Amino acid sequence: MDVHFYEAFEEEIAMLRQHLPAQVHAHFTSDTIQESGDTEPPAELISIRTQSVIPPAWTGKVSGVVSRTTGYDHLVGCRIPCGYLPHYCSHAVAEQAILLVMALLRKLPAQIAQFPAFHRDGLTGGECAGKKLLVVGVGNIGTEIVKIAQALGMQVHGVDLVEKHASISYVTLDDGLAWADIIICAMNLTKENVAYFSYETLKRARKGVVFVNVARGEFTPTEDMVMLLDESHLGGLALDVYENESKLAVALRSGQSGFPLLGRPNVILTPHNAFNTAEAVDRKARQTIQQIEYFIAHKWFLWPVP
């Protein structure tokens, strides 16, 4: 079977090639479907990440779509059989979330900027131990965040529709916002919770709160984040995901600038890279091949999109 991989980066391609079975003929590109300009599907089975949009005209021409992602909101409504990878990167994303928290607490961007003058004024940061962390969305990733945070001595509360972990103290969103020093968004995206962390919502949080989003960019409207920073309501902001991310990624890759969150000393922006460890990329490659082999045998996916 021919499989075409979109949005594949160098290390990922190397891992996939290691695990490809003989009956799979693979083609790779770093482009999204839209960047590639493909008007017809290049293979019977295609694989994407979050920034490609499946053209409606490909329905009936493609047998299946494998998304190499833990989320699947970008596939909701697709009329082609779709699979995803729910388990490959939970710990990797959780580690990055805590990494971003630490970097903001210790004012790492300012530390780096002030090294050339070896200047320490204004660089006094904070420690994790004793801080109050609210994890919104206590699923696979959120659970790992809680484990790491508790090991660091943080006080942790969770917000979730399903309170399934006896070891986690759950609160309402409003109670959590009023309590937390730090908020991490690890939710699943649905059509009901777009813009969940709006200006109005985060204004109910304590002034100076640190906010991190490693889930989906649709939760955090860019204009709202700008206003909260300009008003000094957010003490720090870290994003790995972005509103209108597919358009933003294309603009940045083509050299366009002007993203309003760039260049702020209390903001850290990473290119949707929280999943990207050698261990997670290897798991992703193995599980992608599992999906493909299962699809060849059963015309369905081992982990289908619900």
Tell me the role of every PLM-derived stretch.
Residues T59-V65, L75-C82, C185, L189-E231:
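Beta-strand-loop-alpha-helix segment that lines the small-molecule cofactor/substrate pocket
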Residues P41-P42, K61, A178-W179, R204-K207, ...:
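Alpha-helix C-terminal capping/helix-to-coil transition sites in glycosyltransferase folds
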Residues G208, R216-P306:
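Rossmann-like dinucleotide-binding domain for NAD(H)/NADP(H)
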Residues T50-Q51, T70, M187-L189, A215-R216, ...:
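Short glycine-/small-residue-rich Rossmann-like dinucleotide-binding loops
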Residues P41-I112, G126, F211:
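Phosphate/diphosphate ligand-binding glycine-rich loop within oxidoreductases
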Residues L123-K207:
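Rossmann-like dinucleotide/phosphate-binding beta-alpha-beta segment
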Residues M1-A43:
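N-terminal glycine-/charge-rich "phosphate-binding" loop or analogous flexible N-terminal tail
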Residues T29-P42, P56, H165-W179:
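Short acidic low-complexity segments
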